Amino acid sequence: MTWTAKDSGGGLWGPGPNVWRSDNVAVQGDTVTLSVRQVDGVWTSGEAILDRSLGYGRYEFTLLQSPYLDANAVLGLFLWDDDPASPNNREIDIEFARWGNPWNEAVGHFTLQPWDQPGRQISYRPADGPQTCRMTWSPGYIRWSCAGISWSYYGADVPTPGTERVHMNLWTIGPVEGAVSAQVQFRYRGQALGRP
């Protein structure tokens, strides 16, 4: 599998919006390191994008450090389809974010977009330390799990495969204390054809 890095060329792109730099993404073996840092007085973010679509299956993201990041940092591990005709961009998310509140302990989020419709997101307090999170995507069914927390969504509105790809990003909703980084390992475990 090959990762490419998002680069906005100094412009502001979503999410955020943020300035995205390719040098805020480093790949070594099966580990992707994402960074948020200040460059010439501007906060910049990093996003890695897998080179191909994988479709139904089990997506595993191993976070090599605590998910409790700076209050203004957001770590996203998700599927996204750039096709504007795709339903809600086929976005299926695992996120770690305090959303600006340093006292927020429910920093883990499992989401099937759009998040603001009832029953499409849960927030939880994750374990503090390295952990493996999974999204199992099957026809009409998605199951998320992370360090003993699990949640499932069933329905005809679960997206079918298209041209979605795995994205991993680290971005900011405001200034952070120094540079912030996250190390993630990704594995794909094969096609899932039914409900477990």
Language model regions located:
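Hydrophobic residues embedded in beta-strands of well-ordered beta-sheets
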Residues: 25, 30-33, 102, 142
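Secretory/extracellular carbohydrate-interaction modules
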Residues: 34-105
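Extracellular/lumenal carbohydrate-interaction signature centered on repeated Trp-anchored short motifs
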Residues: 48-58, 122-129, 159
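Short, aromatic/His-centered strand-loop micro-motif at the edge of beta-sheets
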Residues: 109-132
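Localized edge beta-strand/strand-to-loop motifs within extracellular or lumenal beta-rich domains
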Residues: 126-143, 147
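Extracellular glycan-recognition surfaces and repeat-rich motifs
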Residues: 2-31
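Ligand-recognition surfaces built from glycine- and aromatic
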Residues: 56-58, 84, 157-196
